[in-house]
């Protein structure tokens, strides 16, 4: 099995300690060969003690070795270290203090040993979990440390096999093809004649494309054959750091020459050697100093908002405990003072015969009460929450709806402690490219020398891809809506659903069969789908390219070949040369297939993510294939018949079997100790020459096509476009690039320098020597916003200058046109350098490369000096298709009350076009565009926009004066009054955003953005993205979520409260930095609206239940103090008191916290506005906490005094009377939990039954066998006696019901008269929808008479009320209207024919504005249902049916409670029948002017009243 490198991400958080480095190591690291004797020693001294490094500082310096150690404990340190870590949690310290306080004789309340049991149990459970995790890490470390590699030995003068853990800095390591790199190694030798090495970094960053690494520049010229014994060079490099994209340093050779070191010279630990027979290098960083392990910091610990609120409530409980204990202490002191003379009759004196003074007795009583009432602080709360969160994550991972079949990936939960935050998100910050779009760049249009080439044929080709997608979805939808008349059973609908999903799955498999088979048999090449590779050239441009080629073929031997071309043709030629060579694309020829064998990935974490934890205990439910993360293909075909599915399945099965055979026969690296020394080198060498070829690769070889592996999809798209015009990139080395042309043949350009792309310059350049002219040319491509500013100034005096201005003006117009069409734009430019200019620039550039400390700054300045006075060649437009389901997902998230901000680096026009396509912007809404050239202009524009917004929404005004804007802003919610206009959207570019994020303007910008419906930030850098998220999070105190797919989104993801990464084509950096990872953007809908809501609701109710339960139990003990002189005595036996919360009542609440579903998933998805309850913290807020505390106090009062009155005149002892009190408390807790439980499963019943059985079983056994264990209690035969007493059963029946009556009454009254959105959703979900026919199925095969296609299309978006039959829908509609319509709006009730069908409306129409101030689009839709005439009824029967709405209220699903709900709702039914039926006068009529979604509900009611 393969193991991923990031599995050791837990290393930093697991407590390992890196070996301490000596402080005098300096600001850089100097490394020399370990084969040389150390300075200051004799030559015979070879090597050094283990763990030591030989450096050029004249002495031995201790550095980290290559041993991987992620464990935290040893056998001796486990117990003290683990306890020390657990005591970092203040709750554990508190309970240990209480347990130790119980050992003081003067204040003890329980037996000391028994009081320690709960806290020891909690500590033991946590310790066992930590021990198991650490042991798993130890086994993983041992396996990795004992992997083998070849290290050069001076004694044997050859490479010998050594363990990874034995590698040291300065050792020479030889690696073969397909071998994992054991440390960070400087590449000194390669079997490739050009000194190249290909590595695969999928284990490190998830990118599947190969990266090129090259031997140190100049080293291969100094030595013809690398020999470690003769290596005397000195390496000076930077100290260890976690920057994967940077390596700075230089190597000084023995002749004094100095060469700069770059990231291209460094082989990183965890990467895999590909397509290279053998390489050798010297170890620079080892062990925990390698960049891979420095980046593996593990999942971040975040504290959820609910947990922060819970900690605050825990402090309130502590304060309440102190107050109760203080009250009891004062009471006991007063009691002792009053009965001082009579105390000797019933109190035990001290050892000297004296009695305690009232003050001393009060102090003792205070501490004793702290011990007795310690259960007020829930000891098991934190452990229970951790258990519930782990189980919640398990069920989220098991959700098949979050599995993406196309990419064979599913949701990953990387943070286990913030699942409830998913249900409280208010702001979503999203990247565009790769997040909202497919990140499949397709060359669409271009302009060269001011002439535009539309590529109409290419547009038609892309249209065929889209048609294929739509045809597939249409066929699937038709198959899914076939109506089977006469099948009314539920099993039939389930069978049809399963069949529909199967057909859809088969269709996907069949339409992508070719791409998937290629992916299964060979490693997937990123950005190389047929849609991306197959470019249809424009005929006019192709003719010009051919003309250039023919002219140059004739004039190539002349002195200036390019001079024979016209300026237009010269630009065309340079344009495609720039597209071909101005990149970092790696070319893989067909005769050089990517070799790959099954090897073990380097690192394995015991619990890297929850998926690893789950795979250890449960088999995977999801079908797993051999497709990579980047295996995305949009090529779809439509099968004409179902029989076409069978061959696809059989072929896939055959290929899967073939792959398994290949995997079994492929060689792998030995990982279990030493292999035999005999023939060891031969086995490594044979492995290096392994050439495994699969049918897919053979097919590619036969086709003779080159494989391009690019770091970005834009580069791949441009290279494929150039190849379509017969300008093919055929080879790339570190110092040359070869291009194939039809008539010219192969042209080899000397590659002098490559200035890579960065987010600040927003461009990249290459410096080459032209083979035809021997000139030094600079080709630059980048964003039009920067390249246009770098062009050579044109003079209007000469004709050439005017012509260039005209070309630039046309090009800019075409760029704007491309952006409006949603295309990504790039400008291509060129500069010719003279030899003097190049020599001057080269000198400064070499100095910048040799710098170690400030290399980035110097290289940036060097690139800026070079990329000036450019000549514009043309521009390109690249299309990036929108992901499937993005518009629908954005619409649902908006209905859920989420505000979506898109932060993209694209051009403003492009971003706006994509925003319209994904429905982020609507064509009918106003868009505020904020573009400023200076900070003063930005401030003025912000003031103007704020004035405009305030004039549109008068209620949304600034409460602070202008002078207070720099200090702070008063953020008021957007007004939702009837006179308020729809909120506009805001678009801002990167330059203006930089000004708006200044301290003086950030409050204005944030206030303006808060008033807008959507925000679109264009040309934003990664730093700006993180600053925007941080600003919203800190200023608005709102829950934020950031989602992205690339490395430029990492900072934004890490700053947000919840970070979501998309496993796209640009690697796994975003996923590795995220809390959750999803395959596609559309899965965010279900993750937030369904699982986020469930997780928040479950944990909120569970935490409240914990506080209620403990407070109620403490209340029983508190009321008893009034009858025992506040002496801190307890009527409940010690065993029950200590283990009640830990054993008897813990399981049911855990089951409810894991499995409860307050609203079904389909209802949450149909009505996303239900999500707002979590945003507003409706289920867990301070008000709910204190109401639960008051309810707990009342229940404890009832549960105490009912058995007290029942046994008032009896002669039972205090512990016999306390046992019924304990049983009553248990029954009350379980019934209370039953009321709060919305979804009952057999596990809920089992948990409640088990708790009851466990309590009575323990009581019976304890009362029989341990009667005198803990004096002074004597519980002998107590429970047996009570079980034979009818009074015991009567009190256990009456007390819980009496205690819960106020809660039952309140919930029934509130659920009937003032229901919340969630309660209405639950009521509607209980309606038996399956017995009525679905209109979509009824009319699937034909259009009903009298209905247009528009009406049928509207039915697809109808709410759940509209899918109900008329009688049920009208009842729910009346119920909603009655709760929201005021007497003024309704007017006088009019006589209504109750046989007239009622008008239908969407769910929660009346209450949609309560939580968020907005409502869904409303409209009355006429619906025809079979059998309507039979279901029309009289007024009496109509009222009777309306009463069924109150038959099962929202507080639970127990049938025996329904009578209370029915009784409380009868009064509302009478009012309902008179006020809500007035709206129905005619059947099938529509409102003339349906209200807009932004309008308030009362405006809609006013229109209805006016219409009636």
From Swiss-Prot:
It is found in: Cell membrane; Endoplasmic reticulum membrane. Residues 694-705 have a biased composition (Basic and acidic residues). Autophosphorylated at the conserved aspartate of the P-type ATPase signature sequence. The modification Phosphoserine is found at residue 470. InterPro entries: ATPase_P-typ_cyto_dom_N (IPR023299), ATPase_P-typ_P_site (IPR018303), ATPase_P-typ_TM_dom_sf (IPR023298), ATPase_P-typ_transduc_dom_A_sf (IPR008250), HAD-like_sf (IPR036412), HAD_sf (IPR023214), P-type_ATPase_IV (IPR006539), P-type_ATPase_N (IPR032631). Found in testis and in white adipose tissue. Also detected in fetal tissues. Residues 102-107, 336-366, 1123-1134, 1207-1213, 1264-1281 are exoplasmic loop. Residues 1-79, 130-313, 389-1101, 1155-1184, 1237-1242, 1307-1508 are cytoplasmic. Mg(2+) binds at residues 431, 433, 1045, 1049. Its cofactor is Mg(2+). Keywords: ATP-binding, Cell membrane, Endoplasmic reticulum, Lipid transport, Magnesium, Membrane, Metal-binding, Nucleotide-binding, Phosphoprotein, Translocase, Transmembrane, Transmembrane helix, Transport. Component of a P4-ATPase flippase complex which consists of a catalytic alpha subunit ATP10A and an accessory beta subunit TMEM30A. Catalytic component of P4-ATPase flippase complex, which catalyzes the hydrolysis of ATP coupled to the transport of phosphatidylcholine (PC) from the outer to the inner leaflet of the plasma membrane. Initiates inward plasma membrane bending and recruitment of Bin/amphiphysin/Rvs (BAR) domain-containing proteins involved in membrane tubulation and cell trafficking. Facilitates ITGB1/beta1 integrin endocytosis, delaying cell adhesion and cell spreading on extracellular matrix. Has low flippase activity toward glucosylceramide (GlcCer). This is Phospholipid-transporting ATPase VA. It comes from Mus musculus (Mouse). The gene is Atp10a.
